[in-house]
Amino acid sequence: SMRGRGGLRTTVTTREQTIVDCLSHPDRCGGIEEALMSISLFPYVDAEALKELVSDKSASLAARTGWLLERKANKWRITPDVLDEFEKMAKGGPFKLDKDSTESRGWSRRWRLCLPEKEEEVEKWLL
């Protein structure tokens, strides 16, 4: 959306849209590690708004988003039923956490997601 202040107009985004943008195009955010570090600092997210943004996108985005939500479930108060809904949207696979990565050193079974490093290492990127 556009917001004006003192005659200046600036484009702003929601936390949820930022998550979708970062997980869709990590190359525009300094890479997947930087993207995950940045978005994991959000104090909270609106899971319903995020679900709505992801619902008309790819199953791979649903898998990446579901994986992130599962890891941040306690901090962001994400309920198991929300994770189940993302899992239903993430049909098919396997998918890649970083679609540009040539490496696949880790695997998330629930999300059928290839990780660029072992899962324990990737989880360290989440702050």
Predicted feature locations:
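Hydrophobic alpha-helical interaction segments
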Residues: 1-127
